[in-house]
Amino acid sequence: MRTIVFLIVSILLLSSAVLMLAEGNAASHELQEYPIEESLEEQRKCVDGSCDPYSSDAPRCCGSQICQCIFFVPCYCKYRGK
């Protein structure tokens, strides 16, 4: 009975270790596809203030901000959830 429990626990631990390694490899592959230089370049192109969601030429809001427009008030960048 003990050997069966030991075998089952060993299989579970081994399978979870394999899944964790596979997940880590996938994450490192995603990081390689999206280099830091591109991320920094995108941050330089964003704006922290006014924005225009209807123009493709206008700079977009930075990071976790969204462009919000209310009737006649000019559009501005605001943090999500606030």
UniProtKB/Swiss-Prot annotation:
* Residue ranges the record assigns to the propeptide: 27-44
Pull one GO CC term from this UniProt entry: extracellular region
Supply one GO molecular-function term: toxin activity
Q: Which domain of life is it from?
A: Eukaryota
Record's keyword terms, sorted: Amidation, Disulfide bond, Knottin, Neurotoxin, Secreted, Signal, Toxin
Q: Kindly indicate where the leader peptide sits in this chain.
A: 1-26
* Annotated positions of the Arginine amide modification: 80
Listed as disulfide-bonded, the cysteine pairs are 46-62, 51-67, 61-77, 69-75
One further remark on this entry is: When expressed in tobacco plants, the toxin induces a significant resistance to the insect S.frugiperda.
Name of this chain's protein: U7-hexatoxin-Mg1a
Taxonomy of the source species: Eukaryota, Metazoa, Ecdysozoa, Arthropoda, Chelicerata
